[in-house]
Amino acid sequence: MNERNEGYEIIAAETYSTSRLGQESRIVLGRMETKHGTMFVTWESTRWPLSDGGAKSDYYWGHYHDDEAKARADYHRRLTEKYER
């Protein structure tokens, strides 16, 4: 995966909904190396296709973590909440 946002490398992303126009609603997990250690974030994300074959993404409602296990647990919890709707 070669996706980045706000300095975070997106290391996991799962689509939980797709509109008929191809817009995807996702939960993503990001990682960033800093001088203070590795930081993690989970975001909700909307991704839609562009006419040139690429895609545009927006990221919002971030949950920030300094522990990978907690970030991954948050990632899975957020996905579970979306699938249970």
Q: What are these model-predicted stretches?
A:
Residues 57, 66-83:
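A short, charged, amphipathic alpha-helix used as a generic interaction element across diverse proteins
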Residues 1-21:
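Negatively charged, low-complexity tracts enriched in Asp/Glu with abundant Ser/Thr
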